Amino acid sequence: MVALLGELRREMNGAVVDSMREKGIEYALSYGVSIPTIRALARQYAPDDELARLLYQQQVRELQLAALSIASPESVTEEELPFWAKAVTTVEMAENVATVLIGRTAVAKVALRKWLADDNALLRYAAMLVGGRCNELDINDIAESLTKALSDVPVGLEVVTTHGAAVLIGACGARSEEQRLAARAFIDTLPEGSLRERIEDEAGWQLEQY
């Protein structure tokens, strides 16, 4: 861990840290290292699940993000999902937890179901991105949970939440003609308003034809 931390600190970018703070992206400690750089450095240590868990428990942005690339997706179990969920406190972490690790595991569908019903809106966003990577997902199986998740979106998270929903709905609709029609019908059930309009704008074109 010490060696990786040293490498990350050498890549520190104060301007990025300041920019993140201005955008309201807060971490206990951040060096402002770019995600591609973090991933490149982390790959030198992968796979190492013990190291990944140790890094993920540190209150340092770069170490938590590196942990996601060092962990082995094949080793993640349902029992470990709460562990990986606990650092999802920013949009950036939600996106990376979902796409770098959990969306590539055998328990992705379990994570989708559990996280979509969570009180943490960022974890619900992560769930949607995970769902976008799940194979053989039926929109009808998640319609109720997704509708509920979209009915309780905190101020400031409207754009990312509708993006997550569009990713999930579009992915479901791309799997078959039946799912395309079901996804199209699901959007039509949503209450009229800006959230529905954003989802329609982003996912609608994917559902025009299979």
Which residues fall in each region the model found?
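Alpha-helical scaffold domains
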Residues: 1-210
